[in-house]
Curated annotation (Swiss-Prot):
SUPFAM superfamilies per the UniProt record, alphabetical: P-loop containing nucleoside triphosphate hydrolases
Organism: Culex quinquefasciatus
Subunit organization: Heterotetramer of 2 NUBP1 and 2 NUBP2 chains.
Compartment(s): Cytoplasm
Entry keyword set: 4Fe-4S, ATP-binding, Cytoplasm, Iron, Iron-sulfur, Metal-binding, Nucleotide-binding
Binding site for [4Fe-4S] cluster 1: C19, C33, C36, C42
Sections of the chain in a coiled coil: none
Single GO cellular component term: cytosol
Domain of life where this protein originates: Eukaryota
UniProt protein name: Cytosolic Fe-S cluster assembly factor NUBP1 homolog
Family: Belongs to the Mrp/NBP35 ATP-binding proteins family. NUBP1/NBP35 subfamily.
Cofactor annotation: [4Fe-4S] cluster
Transmembrane segments annotated in the record for this chain: none
Role played: Component of the cytosolic iron-sulfur (Fe/S) protein assembly (CIA) machinery. Required for maturation of extramitochondrial Fe-S proteins. The NUBP1-NUBP2 heterotetramer forms a Fe-S scaffold complex, mediating the de novo assembly of an Fe-S cluster and its transfer to target apoproteins.
Amino acid sequence: MSSAEVTAAAKPADAPEHCPGTASESAGKASACAGCPNQQICATGPKGPDPSIALVKEKLREVRNKVLVLSGKGGVGKSTVTALLSRAMAQHNPDRNFGVLDIDICGPSQPRVLGVLGEQVHQSGSGWSPVYIEDNLSLMSIGFLLGSPDDAIIWRGPKKNGMIRQFLTEVDWGQLDYLVLDTPPGTSDEHLSAATFLKVTDGRWGAVLVTTPQEVALLDVRKEITFCKKMAIPVVGVVENMSVFVCPKCATESDIFPAKTGGAERMCADMEVRYLGKLPLDPRLAKCCDEGKDFLAEHAGSPTVTALKGIVARVQEFFETDRLTCTCVKRVLT
């Protein structure tokens, strides 16, 4: 392990920002420990790294790329973008394997969106087996563990963190080229847990942020970008969802959510992150999500599908282009 990995491994997944680490002499005693759910355990327990970190690293050793889908604002289409992104990559790369992990613990929607609502997770000797949507696309969600889709999950942070830890250590993903994680809105327990665990795994990882054009959404996405920078999460870029409405009859574009301050593209320029592209609003997409149908197959000629292809290409470029080579080439050219 590198020194950075050791530092990360010495902090619980639900630790506060300035946690001294479980191996520190001030563990459970520092001012940053006040209010932490682990304070008493750290103060009295043996000093050492969180064993879950090594477990996660081992379990995900065959997962090449991890994609966090984030947004500070709810209702902007994170789950829809997660489903579209994973389906598109799986269909365009039939010889590769993809997985979706739904860590929106209190509002799991991927089972419905991906058309496997009501399926059950099976236990094997190597852990939980994810539910397969296609031969090369699988899903794990707490939605599969509920007795009814109407059941409410009323959990505090530590229990959510424990569930995410369980997903990352007990699901038998096998070899994956991409694992796409659907997250809840905000910058809270689920995001901290996922970032803490993923940052020490092998391979590449990064965050795709989703927004809509209006300022009320951009305001929270700016905070999410700041969160990523503070947590050292590589930012793949920003997707502007529901950017325009394209009339299916005459192809005329209408701004349903007018961008008052330049929209996501201007925000990306200001905050120095990549603008991945915009997805037009299509009512047929909402219908497909509700019914668990594959929008890409049902409406292959939609402007949304055309735009999605460009976004998928840019996401895969981030993970599969040798960044060191690109940097060196850029320096030579300049």
